[in-house]
Amino acid sequence: MLALLLSLGIGGLFARSIWTLREEAWNNAERTNTNLVRALDRSIARTMEAFDQSLQGVVEGMTDPRVMALPLAMRNLALFDNSLRVQGVGSILVLDPAGNVVMDSEHAVPRKANFADRDYFKVFESGAHTGLYVGAPVRARLSGLLSLPVSRAFYDSQGRLAGVVVGTIRLAHFQGLFEELNVGAGGALNLFRADGVLVARYPYSEDVLGRSLAGTPTMRNLQAARSGTFTGRAALDKVERLYAFRHVGDYPLMVNVAQSVDSILAGWYRSAWLSGSFALVLMAACVGLAVLDRKSVV
């Protein structure tokens, strides 16, 4: 009986030790992912803030008669100078009420194009939105680069739409941020619009950019709080991951760091197997010695 109790005690101690190792591995992953997503949040928020300030500067200039009275070269410099300092930014365009390009940050004589069909123009044309608008990721019509469009409208003295200022942030900028981080085998990094549209992802796949994941369990968790962690199975590749997420400042964007559960527990699986095997050997030895001792007494 004593040998049985001793072997059970050994088994209990090892089981507790194995479970403690699992908790430590999990808690360490949560802390690491939370720190990573906080760093991404700050970086993306800084980019968005600087870019929005540039757009607001163009809006203010377009409604300032003194700026609009300047010679063309000076006017372009006054309107677009700040945008040149924002990392990852493409061109900034000013569209008239019909969606035609009337001013262009990259060309003194604006390129001919119409964007009346784009969501970032139509939301202001219909009066459905005010303030900053973040569009769905698109391949820019003029540059051909995958970009995230961001726009603001300006109005005449009667409150009617006078035009839209739209600029783009190259998706390669976000990909560059993601590729600097190591989330292990099976890990993923995602930037979403608040409505569930995928803006950028690591590992990179152009096919999924712009896809809406609204209504999926993962998206419902992301939208339920400003920040946090949860475990879930990804809608895109069905991999079970630990997610750490944050909403980006006051912008309609969410970023997450997702580490695969298998990657988090890989080291623990090995330790658990070794410790468990050793515990079984000790338990068997205790029972075996007890049996031998009993036989010698008999």
Where are these regions (language model features)?
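Extreme N-terminal signal-anchor transmembrane helix of membrane signaling/transducer proteins, especially
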Residues: 1-20, 276-290
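Juxtamembrane extracytoplasmic/periplasmic/luminal helical "stalk" adjacent to the first N-terminal
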Residues: 6-70, 81-89
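Extracytoplasmic/periplasmic ligand-binding sensor regions of membrane-associated signaling proteins
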Residues: 83-91, 97-181, 185-188, 233-235
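Amphipathic coiled-coil signal-relay and dimerization helices
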Residues: 95-106, 196-203, 243-245
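Short loop/turn elements at sensory-signaling interfaces that couple input to output
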Residues: 154-162, 248-252, 276, 280
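Extracellular/periplasmic juxtamembrane segments that couple receptor/chemosensory ectodomains to their
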Residues: 195, 206-276
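Conserved small/polar residues in nucleotide/adenosyl-binding loops
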Residues: 295-298
